[in-house]
Each structure stands twice: as structure tokens, then as C-alpha cells.
Amino acid sequence: MFVEVPNDYQAIQKIAVKILNEPRSWISVPDHINYFNYSSLRKLLVRVGFKPVKRTTTYPIYALLMMGYNFISNKEAGPKAHQKRVNFELFWDKINLRRIKHLIYWFLSALGMGRTVIYYSKREI
């Protein structure tokens, strides 16, 4: 089974709130009423009978804030931020090093970072 949820309340988001004085833009009530991190999603999967076998993430979009690309305060920067993420994804595919991208995402997930929490799990029998 594949499960992907937003990775909100992660360290890089908290840093953006504190250092850049940005609002907690990831809070979206009533759209999102439950928030997960790697630990809480893993616990849920185990509780309902699944064994997590692999975890990973997606591009850490909030890292762009640390590089001076503020897509939160400047809404016009949103599409450009998205394009930067897409360019990063396509770069690794273009040079036939997709495995490097997967290793980067795995490492980010090991640090609790990345835009999403992704688990591949199998049903415990």
C-alpha cells in the first residue's frame, strides 16, 4: 500500500515562521484537520495492521524560503516556486540519475523533512 500525506509542522516550516516571521501557511481548516509526521503515520499504519517497508518524501518546497524565495508573502512567486520544484524533479530524470533523486528524498525523510510523508507498507497477515 502507498500512503502520502502532507508533512506539516516540520522543522523547516517552524524555522520559516520564527526567522522569516511568516504565518503558519500550512494550516488549512477545514480542509486539513489531521496532521501527520513520519512517526505518527507509521504508528497509525501499524495499528491498523500494516508493516511499513519503505519511507520517502517529495521536494522540500519550504527550503525555497531559506533561499530567499518567499512564495508565502509573495503569491506571484507561487507558480515560480512550483516550477523550481518541477525543474529539480526533471533534472535528475533528464541526466538519467533518478536514483540520486530517490536517495536525496530518502535522506530527507530520515531527517523528518520533505514536503510529504510517504510510506510503502504491506498488510500483516
What are these regions (language model features)?
Residues 38-58, 90-97:
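A SAM-dependent methyltransferase catalytic signature shared across enzymes that methylate proteins
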Residues 1-20, 30-50, 118-125:
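Conserved SAM-binding loop
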Residues 2-4, 21-23, 85-92:
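A generic short-segment signal for beta-strand/edge and adjacent turn/coil regions
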Residues 11-15, 54-55, 64-65:
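Extended hydrophobic-aromatic, low-complexity segments
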Residues 57-125:
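A C-terminal cap/extension of S-adenosyl-L-methionine-dependent methyltransferases
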Residues 25-28:
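Glycine-rich FAD cofactor-binding loop and adjacent beta-loop-alpha segment at the N-terminus
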Residues 18-22, 71-74:
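Short, hinge-like loop/turn segments at secondary-structure boundaries
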